[in-house]
């Protein structure tokens, strides 16, 4: 959740670190800080609040001259968000500065041991324990590398660490366990970061650190050591993302830009995967025999990716004619899941670093299941540890609220269902062909929706004044309702809940009163009559209803509801792919009307790398 940037080279470090932290703002944070080694020694500057406060404090970095440094944006887990608790944290003697993403679970015990040894603490953070323990180990052995090893051997929990020592001012040390960290390679300069977006303007050649590894970074090169501290050579990944894709490009917000990028993102996700009317997934290493022998299928994800999994369940069950389970990753890892050899676990994650999803992946592999990752970030932890990986090719997604990652994950799941169904012989030719044709025209239909947003903007104006909103839907529309509700609550701060329409009578309808906004998602035409009945039901209690439906459904609903937002006709299983766009726009324009911080909603982070 926190952002880490490190630099060693010939340039002034502080301005470069500030730029990198700016590109990590989307991850969420409540304070920021820098530590730089220069002629004046090791100096640290920190500030609570937005990054602008740190930029002003350091005069854009000019107050911290030096060519080696680390920077950090903190999301508070231990101690309130203030200057003292911000990172970098330092040892009492001022010799070490540490930035940290993760949670040190045994920090309280370590802190008490250090206090008994005479250490004094200033902050409430677990990270200061790392810095103080490191200084104590250094005092015992006199060697920075060995001190880091001794310190790491005593830590329990998760960490991505960047370490700067005044006694070795030409280098950084990095270490990782269950939290993302990568190394960037330049010419006469090298980098450290928690996210590749921080480095795109400086290098495209990166190495992703694995758990237990330690790296020593100098201007001349990077030495990487495995868990047993043996030197290792690791594969370099070249990042092809467009630098401009991580810029707003004239849009008011990243979220709006990314909404409008969805047609092209879906085109990229499909390119090369449909040939002559057939789905071809050459990315997969699974043989036809292995596909036919798949036992249970379980989709594991968090947040919006979980909602994608719910849609994927319908697609896979329809195509494969076998049950599919969808689990929240945070529950799966603790549920003693009934999976084993021959079963397939599909892990979905935009970042490929979500901690709960990583833990679920490892639990699945420990039990003998095969793991297929669906991720956006090339070379991420989930991509590396999965048996197979399908990339979504959505490109950088900066806004906290996901948009194009959601739609590309969904189209990849559709392609997977078609491919497996074809191999297994469980999908009929008519359905297969119709789905393929539908996927091929999806980008154009998405562009059609994005060209006509007047009704959505009008609905957002009246929705913006509300404090409670309900979404209802059945079947695929229920899964879509969950995503629409999540989008609205996370960026507009309106209390929003989604319910399966058939459950209204089981308690929820008691919350409907005069003027209550209800968004009825009714794109699934086989159940349109049921949707109309539910609309009548809530209107009888005074609800104000906005219906999201197809062009055909609009004819049945437009005289019954307060407003209708239509989407083009397509195959039923593809409708969530189109229906989500008006819901994304509705959330965006509602939040805009309310003056919310759309790209960086309060209390939220883009990549959740702690429990």
Describe the residue ranges of each PLM region.
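Conserved short alpha-helical segments that host acidic/polar catalytic motifs at enzyme active sites
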Residues: 1-253, 264-298, 334, 429, ...
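Generic C-terminus detector
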Residues: 229, 544, 570-611
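Hydrophobic alpha-helical scaffolding
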Residues: 7-10, 100, 120, 137-141, ...
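Active-site phosphate/pyrophosphate-binding segments
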Residues: 262-266, 270-298, 388-517, 591-611
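Glycine-rich oxoanion-binding loops at beta->alpha junctions
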Residues: 67, 71-84, 275-289, 312-348, ...
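Glycine-rich phosphate-binding loops that contact phosphosugars or nucleotide phosphates
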Residues: 292-434, 438-441, 521-526, 530-565, ...
């Amino acid at each position: 959740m926190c952002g880490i940037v490190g630099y060693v080279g010939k340039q002034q470090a502080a301005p470069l670190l500030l730029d990198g932290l700016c590109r990590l703002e989307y991850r969420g944070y409540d304070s920021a800080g820098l530590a730089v080694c220069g002629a004046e020694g090791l100096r640290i500057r920190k500030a609570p609040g937005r990054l602008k406060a740190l930029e002003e404090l350091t005069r854009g970095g000019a107050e911290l001259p030096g060519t080696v440094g680390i920077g950090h944006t903190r999301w508070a887990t231990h101690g309130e968000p203030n200057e003292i608790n911000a990172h970098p944290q330092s040892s009492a003697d001022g010799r070490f500065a540490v930035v940290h993403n993760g949670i040190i679970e045994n920090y309280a015990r370590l802190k008490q041991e250090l206090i008994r040894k005479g250490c004094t603490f200033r902050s409430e953070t677990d990270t200061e324990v790392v810095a103080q323990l490191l200084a104590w180990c250094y005092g015992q052995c006199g060697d920075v590398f060995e001190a880091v090893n001794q310190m790491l051997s005593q830590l329990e929990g998760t960490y991505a660490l960047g370490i700067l020592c005044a006694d070795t001012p030409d280098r950084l040390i990095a270490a990782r366990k269950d939290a993302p960290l990568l190394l960037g390679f330049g010419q006469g300069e090298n980098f450290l970061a928690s996210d590749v977006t921080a480095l795109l303007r400086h290098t495209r050649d990166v190495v992703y650190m694995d758990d237990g590894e330690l790296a020593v970074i100098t201007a001349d090169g990077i030495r990487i050591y495995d868990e047993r501290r043996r030197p290792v050579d690791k594969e370099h990944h070249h990042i092809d993302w467009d630098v401009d894709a991580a810029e707003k490009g004239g849009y008011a917000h990243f979220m709006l830009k990314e909404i409008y990028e969805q047609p092209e993102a879906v085109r990229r996700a499909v390119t090369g995967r449909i040939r002559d009317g057939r789905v071809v997934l050459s990315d997969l290493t699974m043989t036809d025999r292995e596909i036919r022998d798949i036992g249970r299928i379980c989709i594991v994800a968090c947040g919006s990716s979980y909602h994608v999994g719910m849609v994927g369940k319908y697609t896979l069950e329809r195509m494969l004619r076998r049950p599919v389970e969808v689990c929240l990753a945070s529950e799966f890892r603790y549920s003693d899941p009934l999976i084993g050899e021959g079963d397939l676990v599909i892990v979905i994650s935009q970042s490929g670093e979500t901690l709960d999803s990583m833990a679920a992946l490892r639990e699945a592999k420990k039990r003998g299941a095969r793991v297929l990752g669906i991720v956006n970030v090339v070379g991420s932890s989930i991509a590396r540890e999965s048996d197979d990986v399908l990339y979504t090719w959505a490109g950088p997604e900066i806004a906290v609220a996901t948009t194009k990652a959601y739609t590309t994950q969904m189209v990849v799941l559709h392609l997977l269902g078609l491919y497996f169904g074809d191999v297994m012989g469980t999908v009929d030719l008519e359905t297969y062909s119709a789905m393929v044709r539908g996927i091929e025209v999806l980008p154009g239909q998405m562009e059609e929706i994005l060209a006509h947003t007047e009704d959505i903007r009008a609905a957002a104006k009246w929705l913006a004044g509300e404090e409670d909103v309900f979404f209802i839907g059945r079947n695929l529309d229920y899964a879509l309702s969950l995503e629409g509700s999540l989008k609205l609550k996370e960026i507009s701060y309106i209390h929003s809940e989604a319910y399966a329409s058939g459950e209204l009578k089981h308690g929820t309808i008691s919350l409907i009163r005069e003027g209550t906004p209800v968004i009825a998602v009714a794109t699934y035409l086989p159940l349109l009559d049921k949707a109309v009945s539910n609309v009548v039901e809530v209107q009888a209690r005074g609800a104000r209803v906005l219906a999201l439906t197809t062009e055909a459904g609009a004819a049945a609903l437009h005289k019954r509801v307060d407003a209708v937002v239509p989407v083009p006709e397509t195959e039923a299983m593809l409708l969530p792919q189109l229906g989500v766009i008006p819901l994304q726009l509705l959330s965006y324009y509602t939040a805009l009307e309310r003056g919310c911080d759309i790209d960086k909603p309060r209390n939220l982070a883009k990549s959740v790398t702690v429990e």
